[in-house]
Amino acid sequence: MSLGGDAKIIGGSPAVFKAKRGGAIPAPKLLDLYPGAAAAYSLRKLRNAYAGAAVRIRRSGDNAEYDFGFTGAGDFDTASAEAFCVAGGGTKNGYISKWYDQSGGAINYQQTNGSKQNQIISNGVVLTDGTNTKPVIKMEANKGLVTDSNIQVFPSKIGTILSVFKNTASFGTICATYQAPSGVDWQLDSSTATIGYKWYSSGGGSTKIAANLDVTTFQTQSQIRTSGTVMGIYTNGVKLQDLTIGNDQQSANKVCLGSFQIGSVPSGDWLVGSFAEQ
């Protein structure tokens, strides 16, 4: 997921670039090609210069926590994460206590309440979407993440929200800074047939678009604010509609993932499904 900036989805396989004096230099990753994101989260490495972890995992056996990063290829280090949870014994499950920001802005998603943490490992095995071996974070009722500090997603009334997810329930919030109907805040949600965007300003308002979401596959959803009053809604790179929104500068707030936000605690409109590695 990417918040703010001008990030775009890139298709195809990465190339390997050869240095002039021999050897290989790594192919540019998403944030190398499209820098400037206010925050970015993934189970895949998004920036070659990023040296931090992907996530912090709490294991169920003894509640110990540890940071896990990436392999040399930039994939999530599933082997180390699985071994950590197995060593803890018990149910051998793993839960996300922190999802690290790879943009360099250090605005991390976190959940300190163990009962609300999203699962990533079950019985010692990293969860996948069932069609390949790519890791996913499971989204379900009463579980969600929230940024550890405020973020301005639409600086100067321009910005992009990009997410890759699968929704298997009738309704759920992808991400939001929903504080109250009278504030300058927003909520992005989806059902198994629609994608919706709520822009709360001067009394509020919302728009839902029939997007024919395929619940059996992951969807790439993008919301691109190009001016004060125009918000473009895209599914898998195809524009669905330009929405007319209030010409307001959104407040810098904490962003909630998987539910809407009351204060700083995830609460309600839970997303049921999963987030993919990017």
Residue ranges and their predicted role:
Residues S2-G5, I9-G114, G273-E277:
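GGW-centered surface loops in extracellular recognition modules
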Residues K8, I224, S259-I262:
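Low-complexity, glycine/proline-biased repetitive segments and flexible coils/loops
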Residues L43, G88-K92, S97-K143, Q152-V153, ...:
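Extracellular glycan-interaction surfaces
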Residues A49-G61, I137, I174-C175, N253-G258:
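Short, hydrophobic/proline-enriched secondary-structure or compact coil segments at domain edges
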Residues I57-G69, N142-D148, P181-Q187, S202-K208, ...:
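Short, surface-exposed beta-strand/loop "edge" segments at domain boundaries and coil↔beta transitions
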Residues A73-C85, T194-Y197, T217, Q250-C256:
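Short, surface-exposed linear segments at secondary-structure transitions and domain or protein termini
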Residues S156-G159, F275:
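Extended extracellular/luminal ectodomain segments enriched in beta-structured repeat modules
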Residues Y200-G205, S251-E277:
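Extracellular glycan-interaction patches encoded by glycine-rich segments
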